[in-house]
Amino acid sequence: MQFKIKKSFIISLFIAILSFQNNLYSGPTTLDIDDFGIISLMYHRFEENKYPSTNIKLKDFKEHLNIIRENNIRFVNPNNFEQNLKDNKNQRKVLLTIDDGFSSFYENAWPILKEKKIPFILFVSTREVGSNNYMTWDQIKELDKENFVEIGNHSHTHEYLVDESYEVIKNDIEKSISIFKNELGKNSKFFSYPFGEYSLKFKSLIQSLGFKYAFGQHSGVMDETKDLYELPRFPINEKYGEI
């Protein structure tokens, strides 16, 4: 099957993801010809066409998964994330992440990932769980039972916390941790900064609260040399998701 790669798709870095050994992307951050490691893709909504900046069409999502498989790129299981960071010699890997826990993910993408047992992290903001267009705790617990799924912490309010005081940020994250423990029996070791934005105080707080990894929204390949509290991810949406 031949794919006609659109310019927007190249810009989105998906081609770079599939071509660690070729500098096909010439944007703000290029991948070196010898780069190996983990690329993280970030998705949000599925088949919610009125939100093009955060939505992906299901047919495109399926094609992404197919391309990854056909190019012998490994899906990273978050349960083995630390080992995957260390063991990167001559290996190309992809970590799937889904932010916010929208109902459209559960209804459209989850059945596909479940059937094929494709690993991923689902980041949820605890205040929104159970509200309109968001997953419920029962649905989240269903996913949490699977050994290829990790439920990550995405704050409580999903507000823009970077400019807030240390106490405001601390109260928000501690609230989310408390709810995680009440609902899932544990907090996650993974954190996703709301809007991908963080500061030194924010990063320091996340580390002090026991998280092992935190993700932003910037270009880069992950390996053991990277700051574990500034891990990169590439957002994939309708604009940059078609092939």
Where are these regions (language model features)?
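Bacterial N-terminal signal peptides that target proteins for export
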Residues: 2-10
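Bacterial N-terminal signal peptides
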Residues: 11-19
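N-terminal pre-catalytic segment of deacetylase/amide-hydrolase enzymes
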Residues: 20-94, 240-242
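Metal-dependent polysaccharide deacetylase catalytic core of the NodB/CE4 family, i.e.
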Residues: 36, 41-52, 85, 91-94, ...
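Noncatalytic alpha-helical scaffolds and linker/capping helices
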Residues: 99-100
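Short beta-strand and adjacent tight-turn residues that come in two discontinuous sequence segments
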Residues: 123, 214-216
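Short secondary-structure boundary segments
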Residues: 195, 217-219
